[in-house]
């Protein structure tokens, strides 16, 4: 295996939408950084089975909905 071609693999803290925190190893960020999730398995409708509204941090969901609002029109 070649040296110095792989990204740094270090420990980060992940904070889920309900405030639950856990430590994991990742190439994201720097050692000790905190990754705050916008959506996870506890809040995503695909896993919760409901039609719950998604949290819109940063306007991503609203931009997506505006862009694709007429894509699947129900007659």
UniProtKB/Swiss-Prot annotation:
Q: GO cellular component annotations, sorted alphabetically? A: ribonucleoprotein complex; ribosome
NADP among keywords: no
Q: Which InterPro entries match?
A: Ribosomal_bL28/bL31-like_sf (IPR034704), Ribosomal_bL31 (IPR002150), Ribosomal_bL31_A (IPR027491), Ribosomal_bL31_sf (IPR042105)
UniProt record, GO biological process:
translation
Annotated GO molecular function terms are: rRNA binding; structural constituent of ribosome
Disulfide cysteine pairs (residue numbers): none
Which top-level group of life is the source organism from? Bacteria
Question: In this entry, which stretches build a coiled coil?
Answer: none
User: Pfam families, per this entry?
Assistant: Ribosomal_L31 (PF01197)
Family matches, as SUPFAM superfamilies: L28p-like
Cite the record's note on assembly: Part of the 50S ribosomal subunit.
Task of the protein: Binds the 23S rRNA.
Give the record's family classification: Belongs to the bacterial ribosomal protein bL31 family. Type A subfamily.
Q: What is this protein called?
A: Large ribosomal subunit protein bL31
What organism does the UniProt record list as the source? Nitrobacter hamburgensis (strain DSM 10229 / NCIMB 13809 / X14)
Q: Which gene encodes it?
A: rpmE
